[in-house]
A protein has these predicted regions:
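Jelly-roll (double-stranded beta-helix
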Residues: 2-227
């Protein structure tokens, strides 16, 4: 959609046809400002907020300022867009967009930022969009202590909160998956660059992305019947 966001009388015109074929604009607004929004037709707006002291000015971040990277490897490859993460300035907010091909995993190795096992505390939400209306993904929230372990089936338009622990995502085959992350917590300004902490049980995978998976059929001997 196309939207005009007015901050203290100054208009900012932003538009995006779809999360699947265009990059976003982000308008950062500190506390104490008057904000109005006017949409030229149907539009979807993501609004995230976090406590702030107003150290930074109003600023419109454009797609050319946002770093893009391909993370992971093998069946856990995905594309991450640093929509509002360090070094782009904000007090507490961190924003990512992530694109996961159908059949792939994201957030792998699983990581945490809930204040446990040496991590810093950040709250996080996921907003999901699916390229096909029937598509779905699996979102797991769990802790090593097993006081939390839930698997959620997520579909287009679902919003998921991360109450703590690790939170990997698996896109079903054929289900190209997008999600928007808002994070905020103890990390302020440049501290927002501090990374999460990986699950020690699965951290080894970062050194083994190129290890070949099984080649099928498995070599169980020449006398094994084959279909």
């Amino acid at each position: 959609g196309r939207v005009t966001i007015t901050v203290d009388g100054t208009p900012y015109d932003v538009s995006r046809s779809s999360v699947f074929d265009a990059l976003p604009h982000v308008l950062y607004v500190p506390p104490g400002h008057d904000v109005t929004l006017e949409a030229a037709g149907d539009a979807e707006i993501a609004w995230g907020s976090a406590p702030a002291e107003g150290r930074l000015p109003v600023r419109l971040f454009t797609p050319g300022e946002m770093r893009r990277e391909v993370r992971g490897g093998g069946p856990a490859v995905r594309e991450v867009h640093h929509v509002l993460s360090h070094p782009l300035p904000a007090e507490r907010l961190i924003v990512f967009e992530v694109y996961v091909p159908g059949g792939a995993w994201s957030g792998w190795p699983p990581h945490t930022h809930d204040g446990r096992i040496g991590s810093r505390y950040l709250e996080e939400v996921y907003y999901y969009r699916m390229q096909r209306p029937e598509a779905f993904a699996l979102h797991r929230n769990y802790t090593r202590e097993a006081d939390l372990d839930e698997v959620l089936v997520v579909r287009d338009g679902d919003l998921v909160a991360v109450p703590g622990g690790f939170h990997p995502v698996a896109a079903a085959p054929g289900s190209n998956t997008y999600f928007l992350n808002f994070l905020a917590g103890d990390l302020v300004m440049e501290e927002r660059a501090v990374p999460p902490v990986d699950d020690p049980d699965h951290a080894w995978i970062v050194d083994a992305w190129d290890e070949a998976p099984w080649t099928l059929p498995l070599p169980f001997g020449d006398d094994a019947p084959n279909d």
